[in-house]
């Protein structure tokens, strides 16, 4: 009896494999003479017609390059994919990590987690968790994706049925590949980057804005089929894409994951504000003003969506 079931299972696997091969051959045939350009790939529509879309996922080989926007990418593909997704022109400036800017002038930028950093960390976490899936056997029960997430959630939850940023970070640190995001040349900034990207992941699915994730929010955050939205920053009735910059005196503010992040340097000389140097209180007020613009834009967007 078991031989018959085994033969049936093998037959089903063979049929699925043949269908996958046929779909692949069909796509290869339709897209044979289609050139989509860097950062894009050919896909087949429901009507069987070719179309060019931003690359869904690059191969994870590590060959860092510095983009013309000053950001370090894991490889050429990630750079061109980011350019496609953001609709901006980004070129390879040079191979390797972007060099650290030592100037304390307005060119100095705050350490931030861009959407591409956040999405790369999320991709690595999902890849790690999917590798732990164990299919059901003939006489044993395996582990599906939700069960694996539930296991890690319970392991790092302190008992309040919520994961805060420190607990989430400890969870991520269990996997060396997932945590090894090295956008900056020095380890201290990379360590800070990891914490910022964990905060950005929490913000993705934190529906009640308490900066903690329930299991359902945790499940949504790391759901492979969930497509993180592209958030923009608002300022003076204008919207700015991820990576956009603005300056106030000698400080630089960067748009990252929908939020303005600013340096906090004391200004003097030609960057002096009036007859006084910029105080920490003044800088705080400026950042709060930026965030106020952002919140107003988000509320307007939500109201417009409801009216539609």
UniProtKB/Swiss-Prot annotation:
Record function comment: Secreted glycoprotein that is involved in various physiological processes, such as angiogenesis, regulation of the immune response, cell proliferation and differentiation. Plays a role in the development of the central nervous system, skeletal system, lungs, and ureter. Promotes endothelial cell survival, migration and differentiation into network structures in an AKT-dependent manner. Also promotes survival of cardiac myocytes. Initiates various signaling cascades by activating different receptors on the cell surface such as DIP2A, TLR4 or BMP receptors.
Summary of subunit composition and partner proteins: Homodimer. Interacts with SCN10A. Interacts with DIP2A; DIP2A may act as a cell surface receptor for FSTL1. Interacts with BMP4. Interacts with CD14; this interaction promotes TL4-mediated signaling cascade.
Organism: Macaca fascicularis
Gene Ontology MF annotations: calcium ion binding; heparin binding
PTM annotation (Phosphoserine): residues: 165
Subcellular localization, as worded in the UniProt entry: Secreted
UniProt domain VWFC: residue ranges: 233-287
Stretches assigned to the EF-hand domain: 144-178, 193-228
Cystine crosslinks: 31-42, 36-52, 54-84, 58-77, 66-98
Alphabetic keyword roster: Disulfide bond, Glycoprotein, Heparin-binding, Phosphoprotein, Repeat, Secreted, Signal
Name of protein: Follistatin-related protein 1
Pfam families: EF-hand_FSTL1, FOLN, Kazal_2, VWF
Coiled-coil zones: none
Main location: secreted
Domain Kazal-like: 48-100
Residue stretches spanning the membrane: none
Highest taxon in the source lineage: Eukaryota
SUPFAM superfamilies in alphabetical order: EF-hand, FnI-like domain, Kazal-type serine protease inhibitors
Alphabetized Gene3D superfamilies for the sequence: 3.30.60.30, EF-hand (1.10.238.10)
Classification via PANTHER family: FOLLISTATIN-RELATED (PTHR10913), FOLLISTATIN-RELATED PROTEIN 1 (PTHR10913:SF13)
Domain Follistatin-like: 30-53
Residues the record marks as carrying a glycan: 144, 175, 180
Secretion signal span: 1-20
PROSITE patterns for this protein: EF_HAND_2, KAZAL_2
Annotated GO biological process: endothelial cell differentiation; endothelial cell migration; hematopoietic stem cell homeostasis; negative regulation of apoptotic process; regulation of BMP signaling pathway
